[in-house]
């Protein structure tokens, strides 16, 4: 069985629906042991659909399967005393707890971060909510419930999406949830890095509103710099032209001309003298001011050719791509070669065909992506010996006296420092280290794997 880059990381996942499960999916895909802790009725997404035709009992929602592959499931009633005891026994051996309740819910259960860190001082506690935890700034909306569409609306993305200002449009995928989950996965790995060094965990807070606002960063600087209120641009760009979606003979294509070098290539391919000779289209700024007429000329050309023909003319020369539906994506050789659609077998139900889910886009040269395992049935791992051993992450990082003094670094790296009283450089070879924290900074010289201390 291939091990992922996060193998040994132990995660307790209390989250539901999309934001938290997407976060822990990213971790599980790369080898973390993620234990999904569910109420007796299970995650709501189990019932959301869609369902395969042969799944007569509707036990396997596509929504749930996609986000919860590679995870385990146990049922714990956190409102019961017995459930709390079970949960706390798992916390003792875990590295991370993830939840996406409203602020205060876990505290009311007696299971908030302050309680959990008494049991496990190195625990990383990750909390995603609509408007964030009050300790980092009390929002007037702190206790409002929130889902993706609310975050998209308040964070700014809907305000700049759609054909015009009178038709605000939600972005298709749940980016308010997904981007929040993705950001939190980064936060977790960052906090784990510190916990490995200091054995001290911490609380990570992420507001979905904040995450979407950071995604819409340009509306901040545009308004601040010249009081422009960014508005929906349809399929175009407020500053760059041509940049957007254009009709073709049999569909649509995307073009993204950012600088003049690509503009020259495009105009040579199109062969329209109006584009090459008219001063209105010479510079990025002039093209922006004449966007309507320019887009009309571009589309009058693209509409005469099929997507395949445009691919032959433009592909590899300018930023170009066809507009793909699910049908085209499933057929695309890029997707196949990059393993971006993964097959997941169902070992305990041969009546249901294997699922296919979106792959994980991260690739590591030293850690091939692990095989995807099935999403768990509700409480599938109740009888398993969950977290039989304490964290492998911290077991590997126990400090020797040398590590306490010098941190750790790669095998066979010689460290050279001027800490001798007479200023003469002294070196030693690091044989089992992963990080160094010294003052003054060290000059690092890789001599050889057999270099000796001197």
Label each PLM-derived region with a short phrase.
Residues 181-201, 214-225, 267-274:
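Oxidoreductase and adenylate-handling cofactor-binding alpha/beta cores
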Residues 64, 233-238, 243-244, 352-355, ...:
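Short Gly/Pro-enriched turn/cap motifs at secondary-structure boundaries
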Residues 2, 350-393:
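Flexible, small-/acidic-enriched active-site or ligand-binding loops
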Residues 315-368:
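A glycine-rich dinucleotide-binding beta-alpha-beta segment and adjacent secondary-structure elements
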Residues 1-197, 373, 377, 383-390:
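N-terminal helix-loop segment corresponding to the beta1-alpha1 unit
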Residues 236, 241-323:
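Aromatic-enriched alpha-helical interface/lid elements that frame and gate functional surfaces
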Residues 393-454:
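N-terminal structural module
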Residues 133-134, 165-175, 196-212, 231-238, ...:
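Conserved Rossmann-fold dehydrogenase catalytic segment
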